[in-house]
Amino acid sequence: MERVRGIGGLFFKAKDPERLRAFYRDLLGVPIEEWGGARFGWREHDARGDACTVWNPFSADTTYFRPSEAAFMVNFRVDDLDAMLAQLRAAGAPVDDRIEDGEYGRFGWVMDPEGNRVELWQPPH
């Protein structure tokens, strides 16, 4: 039986794609290419433990994405959550004051210019 081998891309609509690209490029360091998107190479040697991308449908009434009303949330892997959040705050981005520490690592959040909640994840060392 054939099966999917992983996530091939994440595609979504934006009210102001250029502003959104600038936010992700300038504040989060996403390597936006000339064609308008970004590619992230996936190599297991980049991982500090299990190498995976999580796919998980949440219940329609979840509050986990709040205050965003979007039906999705992107999670980006970062090396230093504290440094990333400080960088975002210094740029005036709306960063959630809460940080979660747990067995899966550390989590922080920021809202992008279109009101989407973005999760930042520092895997456990």
Where do the language-model regions lie?
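Short linear motifs in intrinsically disordered
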Residues: 29-31, 76-77, 98-99
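Short amphipathic beta-strand starts and helix->beta connectors
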Residues: 55-60, 93
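Pocket-edge structural micro-motifs
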Residues: 42-44, 59, 122
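Core segments of cupin and vicinal oxygen chelate
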Residues: 2-5, 11-55, 90
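Vicinal oxygen chelate
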Residues: 1-15, 33-35, 43, 61-125, ...
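Sterically constrained small-residue positions within well-ordered secondary structures
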Residues: 1, 48, 65-67, 101
